[in-house]
Amino acid sequence: MARNIDPSFVDQLTPNFAQLFLDRVAKSGSLEAYRFPQGSGWESMTWQQAGDRVTQLAAGLLSLGIQPEQRVGIASSTRYEWILADLAVMCAGGATTTVYPSTNAEDTAYILSDSECQVVFAEDDDQIKKLTDMRAQLPSVAKVVTFDAASAQDDGDWVITLEALADLGEKRFRIE
């Protein structure tokens, strides 16, 4: 039995999760959004700081050519950079493909290749090694972004740091 439902409520829905995040940044800018381990203590990040970082990273992804609905991989354990990367992918209009850090190199390559990931966020040297060892099976991956700056191995710039990605976005989309 069909019901008569007024569809006008659809116009009042938030368009997507990225917009929900940006709305929260606007409403709660100075409040704590995340707390994460740093050295021997804990650091806090406000909603505004998170929003600024996500915007930089999303702009960086766009500068790398990410198009709507293109896949971006994240091979990492749970950490605040994972959250920021995922939000950046959504804000850039992409879609996230996740890979457990315990996944072996062959399965990691299959997951990322099958989903045609263009960019992959990699937590550390262990994740980067899997990707570099299987690079021939990853024809779509144009760039690997590492969360740990020490992991940015010199390989002809296939691997860049999170900071380098943010800088790419900053350079391309800077408002003067």
List where the protein language model places each region.
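Conserved ATP-dependent adenylate/AMP-binding module captured primarily in the ANL superfamily
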Residues: P101-M134
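Structured binding elements
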Residues: G93
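Conserved AMP-binding/adenylate-forming core of the ANL superfamily
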Residues: L13, A33-L87, N104-A109, I160-G169
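Flexible, non-catalytic linker and terminal segments flanking ANL/adenylate-forming cores
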Residues: M1-N16, P37
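AMP-dependent adenylate-forming
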Residues: L20-M45, S151-D154
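Structural motif
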Residues: G73, V119-F121, V145
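ANL superfamily adenylate-forming
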Residues: D126-E176
